[in-house]
Structures are given as C-alpha cells and as structure tokens.
Amino acid sequence: METTMGFMDDNATNTSTSFLSVLNPHGAHATSFPFNFSYSDYDMPLDEDEDVTNSRTFFAAKIVIGMALVGIMLVCGIGNFIFIAALVRYKKLRNLTNLLIANLAISDFLVAIVCCPFEMDYYVVRQLSWEHGHVLCTSVNYLRTVSLYVSTNALLAIAIDRYLAIVHPLRPRMKCQTATGLIALVWTVSILIAIPSAYFTTETVLVIVKSQEKIFCGQIWPVDQQLYYKSYFLFIFGIEFVGPVVTMTLCYARISRELWFKAVPGFQTEQIRKRLRCRRKTVLVLMCILTAYVLCWAPFYGFTIVRDFFPTVFVKEKHYLTAFYIVECIAMSNSMINTLCFVTVKNDTVKYFKKIMLLHWKASYNGGKSSADLDLKTIGMPATEEVDCIRLK
C-alpha cells in the first residue's frame, strides 16, 4: 500500500474544504484525503447510496493492481534475490557500480516480500480497508517511502560515479571507505527525510456508505498544518525527483558526448575498442533506466500536484478511481524495470547464480565435497566479458 495523506482538525469537527473529500452520508464531518506520495484511496467522488468499491470500474482496477503486485513480488523478489546472492558469493562482482546497484536490489527486495503482500490485502482482498493495526500501517508505509528514496539516491550516485569514471578517467577511483560512506549516506538521507511520513501515518475508521466501514491507513496531517505539508511535498519533489533527474540527465549527456562524439586519440587496439563497446552498453542501459524512472514517476508526482494544489480538477470526476490505479501501477512498475535491466541485461549475475546452484547440487550429490573445495572452484572462476564490462575501471 502506498503512502497516503489527508487533513483533519484536532477536534475532528471539520476539515479543510480546499481539497477533495469523502463525505459521511450520515452527517458526520467530511474527511479530506489529498495525500503526499501516492494517491488518496478514498479521495474519489462517492454516491451516498452506492459503494464505489463494488462498482465494475473498481473491479477492473482491482485486477490491474493485483497483477502489478504479483509481478513485483515475483520479478523483484526472485530477481533481486539472485543479484544479492551472486554478489555475496562472488568477489569478482563487488565493484563500486554493483555495490550501488545492490542498494536498489535490497530496497526493492524488502518491498516485494514485506510491503506487497500487505498491499495485496489492502487493495485487492479487503478493497481499501486496513486490518493489520497501527504499527504495521506505519511500518509498511514508511518502508515503501524509504525504498523509493533509496532507489532515487542510488541511481543518482551511479550516474555521478559513471560521470567521474568516464569523463575524468585520470582521477583516482573511489576508495572502499569512501564507497561505504556513500552507501551509508544514501540510506541515511532516505531514512531521515521519510520520517514525517511515518510520524503522520495512522489509521482512521471511515463510514463509506450507510453502516459500512473502511479503515483508512495513511498520512493524516492536522488541518492547520496544510502549509507544512505542501512545503514538505515540494521539498521532496525537488530533492527526490527534479534535482536527481536534472543531475542524472546532465551526467549522461556529458558521458554520451565523451563516448560517442569524441574521437579517441592514437591507435585503437582491439582491447580499447572492446572497452569502449562495454562502456557504451552500460551507459545505454543506465540511460534507459533513467528514462523509465522519469516515465514511471512523472505521472505520479504530476497527479499528486494536481490533486493537492488544484483539487477542483477532480471534483465529481467519475473516472478518478481508474486514473488513480493507472498512475499507481505505472509508478509501481519502475521497480520491475530496474530489476530486469540490472539483473538480466547489465551483468551475468544469473549465470553466476546458476553456477552456485550447480556446485551445491553436485556437492550434495557427491556427498564428499567440502565447502573449502567449493570455495576454491568458485573463486577460481574466470571473469566473463560482461563482468569486465561492468567494472569500467
């Protein structure tokens, strides 16, 4: 379940009227749910005599998001596990670029195995109702938000690393301690800036139609703190989308000029040409990942800005729910694209993982191989061209 946000006053007697609302047909207060990093599950026009969650449109949307969640659990769960296992097992894969990619893999893996099952229950099984308590509500939303920021910051770090390695090759590469500090910074920044989303996340029981209740799980900011919320959202929009996208675009534009439009001085040996091809392939993959990131998350942020800053656009919009799920699924699919690109395209982690399984199967079958024998075999495995490619020294 994505992080959501609404505004409610401290006395629960009235709420902001400048945002879309979910109205209690029995005369209770209206609760507004424009929210921060996702789309308000209840922020849709509801008929007093009809439960929207029982409509045909909602049923179709439920199938779509269910398929997306299953895809994330399978692709990100299995794919990132393979990448992490291969990285742990083989030292040959532990270069700076792969260590940065591992941050994406870990965050996406945690979301796939921890968050997605709860999201499946929330969106598909219980039709927008949370039944797992306040602690899990806060934890799942917080983990999902941190994962998004880790992915963004890691992609930015990878772009800067590629820029320094290719445009300024004579500068010394990042040392192990510096790389460790960079990885720690990626997680620390992501954890800290997501704290407000956890602080304001709570459960709220809503009466949707007649006596039917739905338990909303998401961010609810006090009505007198709307300005703080908008400022916080614009801050996040700037440092976690606009800033990284502009920086990565400039980095890859300069890298492209260096690799494709600048003549290499001197005689080009086959080794130099091979290295150039490898670098071009890696940069193309990274630029495709950047493009996918923009295409997936730009609708997400655009939808949120329209909903939170121009709420009248969605007033009485019958297809709001459909639009919500379309944008939701597009944003969620970005983690699958990253996994497919990094695991199946960028390197040979799948091949290495197969060799791990094969060696352990042979050891179990023969019964006489020690773990030391396996270590000698795996450490002595030759590096493939693709592994050499991703080193980019």
Curated annotation (Swiss-Prot):
GO terms for cellular component: plasma membrane. GO terms for biological process: cellular response to hormone stimulus; circadian rhythm; G protein-coupled receptor signaling pathway. Residues 84-98, 168-180, 254-282, 344-393 are cytoplasmic. It is found in: Cell membrane. The keyword Disulfide bond applies. It is a multi-pass membrane protein. PROSITE patterns: G_PROTEIN_RECEP_F1_1 (PS00237), G_PROTEIN_RECEP_F1_2 (PS50262). Residues 1-62, 120-146, 202-232, 304-322 are extracellular. Glycans are attached at N11, N14, N36. Coiled coil: none annotated. The keyword Membrane applies. Keywords: Cell membrane, Disulfide bond, G-protein coupled receptor, Glycoprotein, Membrane, Receptor, Transducer, Transmembrane, Transmembrane helix. GO terms for molecular function: G protein-coupled receptor activity; neuropeptide Y receptor activity. Localizes to glandular epithelium, stroma and vascular endothelial cells of first trimester decidua (at protein level). Up-regulated in first trimester decidua when compared with non-pregnant endometrium. Expressed in the stomach, throughout the small intestine, colon, rectum, thyroid gland, pituitary gland, salivary gland, adrenal gland, testis, ovary, brain, spleen, prostate and pancreas. The chain crosses the membrane at residues 63-83, 99-119, 147-167, 181-201, 233-253, 283-303, 323-343. Disulfide bonds join C137-C217. Belongs to the G-protein coupled receptor 1 family. Receptor for prokineticin 1. Exclusively coupled to the G(q) subclass of heteromeric G proteins. Activation leads to mobilization of calcium, stimulation of phosphoinositide turnover and activation of p44/p42 mitogen-activated protein kinase. May play a role during early pregnancy. This is Prokineticin receptor 1. It comes from Homo sapiens (Human). The lineage of its organism: Eukaryota, Metazoa, Chordata, Craniata, Vertebrata. The gene is PROKR1.
